[in-house]
Amino acid sequence: MDTSSKENIQLFCKTSVQPVGRPSFKTEYPSSEEKQPCCGELKVFLGALSFVYFAKALAEGYLKSTITQIERRFDIPSSLVGVIDGSFEIGNLLVITFVSYFGAKLHRPKIIGAGCLIMGVGTLLIAMPQFFMEQYKYEIYSPSSNSTLSISPCLLESSSQLPVSVMEKSKSKISLLAAVPFWYLPKSLPRSQSREDSNSSSEKSKFIRDDHTDYQTPQGENVKIMEMARDFLPSLKYLFGNPVYFLYLCTSTVQFNSLFGMVTYKPKYIEQQYGQSSSRANFVIGLINIPAVALGIFSGGIAMKKFRISVCGAAKLYLGSSVFGYLLFLSLFALGCENSDVAGLTVSYQGTKPVSYHERALFSDCNPRCKCSETKWEPMCGENGITYVSACPAGCQTSNRSGKNIIFYNCTCVGIAASKSGNSSGIVGRCQKDNGCPQMFLYFLVISVITSYTLSLGGIPGYILLLRCIKPQLKSFALGIYTLSIRVLAGIPAPVYFGVLIDTSCLKWGFKRCGSRGSCRLYDSNVFRHIYLGLTVILGTVSIFLSIAVLFILKKNYVSKHRNFITKRERTMVSTRFQKENCTTSDHLLQPKYWPGKETQL
């Protein structure tokens, strides 16, 4: 075969054959030979995107950690706090569907940058009430004529006002700063000329293969919004007609209902169940649980890459992590603490149990002349280990400051159920729970860390399953619908109905200055535990059954198609090998040594 023939064959092989009536398409990925901008690298994009997620996690995490502070600051019940927390997701609903659909065909980095700017402005608006509202007025003790000291709120204001405003400002600055790199990124990142086509990844783990020529922007044509909008409803119909995608969407929605409700009220649960302060509860969650979740997500990604897990394997890993995680979660029912001893609410003034709560239960024969308020909540811990609603119902006559603590003396009600020392004094604040509660709290943290790691281990396999069950050109749109469904059906309602049910366990309500009901001051620990954990387990159980259905449909619909594809591919390979052998034999027969008499003389 002469040189010109070889060149023609090579030229024919390199030339793509286009169907009749179909425009030629140009790949979005620029070649490595073309001059790329300084920021047009994958590492720059990943770094910028990681910074964006850091800013987003900082904003959402801070909002979750201030749930109890918002409840006390504005004196509102948990159900209304859930509405405020759920409204954080409402802003995404206005644009997420259209951005996910049209954004896949436009300049994605600039769209992300614009979103970061809007997020920065939003966090700045969250900080505005800190500068325009009046300072919080704490409930203070109104002393009688023979008292020597009143409780001053000055120290509390100086320690609680500053971090709120500083954190709100920091969130806004970080979100605005995160938008800068995306304005300098190109529309598409460069791709190497030779891209390995791994048989294991394309045949073992994918059942819908990427074909970039099917959905790239036509060369020389400007994309019009109306032309893209025509395929919106057909694309939406295709997504909801995909059984694996639809079932996985239902599974994730139910599972995120349990996760959103659990995470939103976890600091409150630690405060009420184990008697920890709000700052300590949030610090422990950030120090232990968040690294466990990050490690679980990273481990899931490493496992998917190292072992080259197939789609069915990813579904099994997702199901296994959910089952094992919720089995561990069941053990938390046994790791609870009993109610604190509060006079008139959980115990009588004599220290006996049980007690039936009613409005007059807060008063006793030891404090008939004190004229105490029924609505005030200013807990005081007596020397007898019983917490009193305030120093007034405890019958305290005098008070004195000892450092940062305020000590009350001559408390007649404390003396009734006094300890062996016979001391009738008390100190501001609630009494610590029994001696076994700190140990229970330690066990709770250990189980919580393991559960967080186990549940997050299935995050990446589930995400890979979501991407591989749909057409490549609909990935962005499918992710947008997925995110929209999670936010509408889980992010918004879950904190609300969790808060409504948690409010049913309240024993002592606070009241606003106008007389209306405010936030809950004291919860029934046992009822709170069963509502909080029980609702989470019920939702988790439903998601497990839906995950089993996803795995069943996946095996039924796609594994059989995958086997048929492999069978056809093997037949094609055998046929191609046979043709190559015949062609090789023909080439050998055309050599001069087989036809010595017919050798051409040049």
Curated annotation (Swiss-Prot):
Record has Transmembrane helix as a keyword: yes
Membrane-topology annotation of the record: Multi-pass membrane protein
Extracellular side: 64-82, 135-139, 261-280, 333-444, 503-536
Intervals, Cytoplasmic compartment: 1-43, 104-109, 157-238, 305-308, 468-476, 555-602
Functional summary from the UniProt entry: Mediates the Na(+)-independent high affinity transport of organic anions such as the thyroid hormones L-thyroxine (T4), L-thyroxine sulfate (T4S), and 3,3',5'-triiodo-L-thyronine (reverse T3, rT3) at the plasma membrane. Regulates T4 levels in different brain regions by transporting T4, and also by serving as an export pump for T4S, which is a source of T4 after hydrolysis by local sulfatases. Increases the access of these substrates to the intracellular sites where they are metabolized by the deiodinases.
Domain of life: Eukaryota
GO molecular function: bile acid transmembrane transporter activity; organic anion transmembrane transporter activity; sodium-independent organic anion transmembrane transporter activity
Spans through the membrane: 44-63, 83-103, 110-134, 140-156, 239-260, 281-304, 309-332, 445-467, 477-502, 537-554
Any one Gene Ontology cellular component term annotated for this protein: basolateral plasma membrane
Protein name: Solute carrier organic anion transporter family member 1C1
Region (Disordered): 190-216
Gene name as annotated: SLCO1C1
UniProt cross-references to PANTHER family, sorted A to Z: ORGANIC ANION TRANSPORTER, SOLUTE CARRIER ORGANIC ANION TRANSPORTER FAMILY MEMBER 1C1
Main location class: membrane
Listed InterPro entries: Kazal_dom (IPR002350), Kazal_dom_sf (IPR036058), MFS_trans_sf (IPR036259), OATP (IPR004156)
Catalysis: reaction(s): 3,3',5'-triiodo-L-thyronine(out) = 3,3',5'-triiodo-L-thyronine(in); L-thyroxine(out) = L-thyroxine(in); L-thyroxine sulfate(out) = L-thyroxine sulfate(in)
Keywords: Cell membrane, Disulfide bond, Glycoprotein, Ion transport, Lipid transport, Membrane, Transmembrane, Transmembrane helix, Transport
Segments of skewed composition (Basic and acidic residues): 193-214
Native source species: Macaca fascicularis (Crab-eating macaque)
Biological process terms in GO annotation: monoatomic ion transport; sodium-independent organic anion transport
